[in-house]
Amino acid sequence: MDAALYFPRLLRAGAGGAAPVAVAASGAVAGVYVRTDVQRGVWRAPAGTDARVVGTVGPEVRLTDGQSGELNRQGINVIRALPGHGTVVWGSRTLRGADAMADEYKYVPVSRLALHLQDSITRGIRCTTFEQND
């Protein structure tokens, strides 16, 4: 329930003025998650125009609106270069988020909030593990 897929890879500047190099988006997307958590909370989607990907030249592949929509319907989140916003994460579906599936954990913020609550409750009641339960 807590996995998501992001496409395409990102381009980072090449060393010493060399051509840009394609790298996996996972590190940059993790950074967007952390920034979203700190600024807005785990219950907010790490996507949209506020979800800028910093430190990259841009996405390896430029997607059209139609291509982005089709990938999103399949549960694949896209990384897009939007005029006026830069490179952003555009989509917040889990791997259970394809339109063909009806799943309560279809979206990243729902899944992450459930995991956060589970962890918080577990930590909160740990001190009562060996208490009597009559």
Where in this protein do the model-derived segments appear?
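A glycine- and small-residue-enriched flexible loop/hinge signal that marks low-structured segments
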Residues: M1-D134
